[in-house]
Amino acid sequence: MPRWRNGRRSGLKIRFPYGSGGSNPFLGTTFDVILEAPLMNPLVRRISNLDLIRGIALLGILGMNAISFGLPWAAYWNLSAAGSETWLDFAIGVFCEIFLDQKMMGLFSLLFGTSIVLLVDAAKERGYRRPVLLSVWRNLLLFIIGIIHSLFWDGDVLRLYAICAPIVLLLRNSRPRLLVAFGIFLVVGPATLTLLLQPLFLSDGSLDMTTNWAMNVGDGIGLGKYWFVESSTFGATVGLFFLLDNLGRALGMMLIGVALYRMNILHGNRSLRFYRLVAITGLLIGLPLSSIGTGWLVTSDFANTIALVSLIPNTLATIPTVLGYIGLISIWDSKVKNRLHTHISAIGRMALSNYLLQTVLGIVILRVVFEQGTLGRSQIALFVIFVWALQLIWSKPWLDKFSYGPCEWILRKLYRW
């Protein structure tokens, strides 16, 4: 008999008996039938592949965010700026640049775009008259949460995502190919501007005040804290670039996420051959590009003269690497459903709670318990592993008892009020 849990029935299984085989694909197959009270939740099953991708992305994001918790911002981009005193520190920094930087945030942004479409579609199925307005209200709440979050850490992405969300809503029904093309343009376009911006800076990283641009901008800060530990601000030129770059990469990946969802790629139910092709092709293109960009910086001893243009290879690598990761994760989701899979998926289902928890732990441990800038990358990596273990341990038991994470529950109550 089906069991009632939190106002909905679950656990009903239909099993077709084993037979002699033939061509019937249903023989020996067990189906989980989710029976939910119609007024409680939409008749939509969670897509396990999305939860798994989101969980892995969130864990990977911490690998980069922890650098900004424990070290000055310059160390995030410039490995020689701080935190790389030993060969192990440096090796960890190179690994993160190649495998994590931009890629994990790209995965996370991609899934955020998908979640916007999922919410609107689910609201329509439930009979909401204004599903788009519901999504706008939800993202306004996320923006408010992001403002509060940014008071403690200036690397918050919730505000950025909330700003991009209305554009995703406007374009969500566009053709997938158009969304992909526009998304690629938004991701790659801002990075190409570095070809114009890099000549504005002198070899010492200061702004060339003889140029028309510098005379109009007039702050004279140069690369600022993007590249130098001793600087406390980005400066107008670098700040404007990162504003455009962050908006472009976030919105671009969201639109690509909508396209991949419409193309039935993110569900994880394409053939294994398809996902193998995506994984191999994406990683063979993306990882060498990231390696070239990182190698360029290392061999130049992180020269000021390539501080901005060196971003181009890694940006070009983002989309193919993200697709490669999606291929690998989808293969895992379809072939192996072990305890690790279950616990990482639980992290993905509680992404907002776990994202905010990472910040709380990062600020408390890496800035209060230990003074910022006193730890190396290898020591910060131990913090990352600790938080991973904590979130792997607590997320699944929480969801066994409750339907949502604590922050997800609060957000849900507010936007469905």
Place the predicted regions along the sequence by residue:
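Short, positively charged low-complexity motifs
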Residues: R3-N6, G19-S23
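N-terminal signal-anchor module of multipass membrane proteins
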Residues: N41-F112, L119
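Functional transmembrane helices that form membrane-embedded active or gating regions
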Residues: R46-A57, V278-I280, D333-L361, S403-Y415
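Juxtamembrane membrane-water interface segments that cap and precede transmembrane helices
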Residues: S84-I98, L223-G239, D301-L311
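Specific transmembrane alpha-helix
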Residues: G106-D121, L158-L170, D245-G268, A317-K337
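Solvent-exposed interhelical
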Residues: R130, I167-F185, A259-T281
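Long hydrophobic alpha-helical segments that form multi-pass transmembrane helix bundles
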Residues: F185-R262
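Alpha-helical transmembrane segments of multi-pass integral membrane proteins
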Residues: D301-K401
